[in-house]
Regions:
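Active-site neighborhood of HAD-like aspartate-dependent phosphohydrolases
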Residues: 1-23
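Short, surface-exposed alpha-helical segments at coil->helix boundaries
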Residues: 4, 39, 96-100
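Helix-loop "lid/cap" segments that line or gate small-molecule binding pockets
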Residues: 6-13, 36-51
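Short, acidic loop-to-helix structural element flanking the phosphoryl-transfer center
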Residues: 39-40, 44, 48, 59-90, ...
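Short, basic/glycine-rich phosphate-binding loops at helix/coil junctions
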Residues: 50-61, 102-107
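Helix N-cap/beta->alpha junction signal
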Residues: 72, 92-94, 144
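Substrate-recognition/cap helix-loop segment adjacent to the acidic, metal-dependent catalytic center
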Residues: 76-89, 93-117
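Asp-based, Mg2+/Mn2+-dependent phosphohydrolase catalytic module
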Residues: 104-140, 144-207
């Protein structure tokens, strides 16, 4: 939804040509970094168009975006529900400023009692995750099959991967062809409220 809202805003504020240029920069940066960086793309846009009088307005739009209104239905309920299984932790990829703000503004930070880690590439930081949050078994929920596959390759049977087919990445045909299916595929994040716990934890006591 943020993509549609920002597209509409850019189209109105800077015009269709510059709107398309912003998204070209955004896509290039996402390919380079591996995550969506809206402010980083705006910084690069600024270098290309340093005299654009709308830059401040676009920055204000992003910083004050109502992320809490854009969560998937029942997402916070799922976070609270997951705390019955064990400690719920947000593992996120992103920049060091905007991503933490998104997590806080959406209400997720308080829902997980501030248990949040923001990496550049979280699938490369599993040793740090294990040190901070040791467990016999992990459950990883992500809409990127690439991430789920990479973590499964490293943790093996110690992790149950869950793939909600919801969001920008979830229906990427190339990813669906390239990577193996997750341990559990669900239609939407809210489905986790009714998933039997035995499908997530292979043996009693693994929490």
């Amino acid at each position: 939804r943020i993509t549609a809202d920002l597209t509409q805003y850019l189209d109105r504020e800077v015009g269709p040509a510059h709107e398309r240029e912003y998204w070209r920069i955004f896509d290039d940066l996402r390919e380079e970094l591996g995550y969506a960086d809206y402010l980083g793309a705006l910084q690069r846009y600024r270098l290309a168009y340093p005299h654009d009088s709308h830059l401040l307005a676009v920055s204000h739009f992003l910083v004050n975006y109502p992320f809490a209104d854009r969560l998937f239905p029942r997402a916070l309920d799922v976070v609270r529900h997951a705390r019955q299984w064990g400690r719920a932790v947000i593992l996120s990829d992103g920049d060091a400023v905007f991503q933490p703000r998104k997590i806080e503004q959406s209400g997720i930070l308080s829902a997980v009692e501030e248990q949040v880690l923001v990496y550049v590439h979280k699938e490369q930081e599993l040793e740090d995750v294990e040190q901070r949050y040791p467990a016999d078994h992990y459950v990883l929920i992500d809409d990127k099959l690439r991430i789920l596959s990479a973590v499964k390759e490293q943790w093996g049977a110690r992790v149950t991967t869950v793939f909600p087919r919801q969001g920008h990445y979830a229906n990427d045909p190339e990813a669906l062809r390239t990577f193996p299916p997750a341990d559990l595929t669900i239609d939407c994040i809210g489905d986790l409220l009714t998933v039997d716990q035995s499908r997530l934890f292979p043996a009693a006591g693994h929490r």
